[in-house]
């Protein structure tokens, strides 16, 4: 099998190392817009975690969305990939989906960017969250959790 050497791949990696509020959402949206305007295929890959993430994007027209499952490049029409290390919460996913129906993306979802989910991603349900809260409440040495 021949290896192609004529393909140029431009990859931008955004890493938060300050416990949040570093502008990861804003930077993802900016880079996605820049790449799409240049005619490049653009996909946002979420590395890990789940719906507790909250990456805020504010558009020039004032529209604001906090991304949980969809990548922060979604409003720029960048696709999203949720890998096996991402924990999907179907209820929060649908809530976010419904919020995005009223976004500048519009209600015609055939024009939306695609979202790909690894078949090995974990699923979190309200039962899981309730169970974790009960366990945490009864620990002798609590370590805290996201919800």
Please state what every model-predicted region is.
Residues 2-147:
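Non-transmembrane, aqueous-exposed alpha-helical and coiled segments at domain scale
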